[in-house]
Amino acid sequence: SVDPTPAPDPTPAPTPDPTPAPAPAPVPQGGQWISDSVGWWYRYADGSYPAGQAVRIGNSTYRFDARGYMRTGWVSEDGAWFYHDASGAQASGWVKDGSSWYYLDAATGRMVTGWLLDGLTWYYLMPGSGAMATGWVKDGSSWYFMAPSGALMTGWVKDGGFWYYLSTDSGAMYTGGHWIGWKWYYFNESGQWNG
């Protein structure tokens, strides 16, 4: 007969990691917004206030400078950029600042750079600034064309009096000879089709 009692596991129990997890931003248990000659700040019910940190108040995230004043506009934190509107609330999704559009991650609020798929449309956000690209963009060794709306173009595009063809799979500009449909086309090194 088989003994149904399991044998003890000889593997020692893992030791806990001595590094504590980072503390989450405090969630205020009541408080009020106060304005003075410098700006807005938030006072907790116990009289303390957040300073030099991001705090969730209600349904929005706010950032406070080292003195405790609410921040607005672009804020850099831990190598990432965030945008806070005039109310101080952290923005997410598409934001227009000046003449440029930016995209802020919906979950974290961080500014996105590089390729972004929003719905069914691809966009390119410049690596240095995060601004949405329009017109010609070079990424790696390939060229792409972004519409005035920022959307990645594919197929035939006419720009500056010349025709170009952008891959329907990747959007990359064609150079050299390619079959498109049932016809052979040749594109010079600049991607221009010379008809």
Q: Language-model segments: which ranges?
A:
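Extracellular adhesion/carbohydrate-binding repeat motifs centered on closely spaced tryptophans
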Residues: 1-195
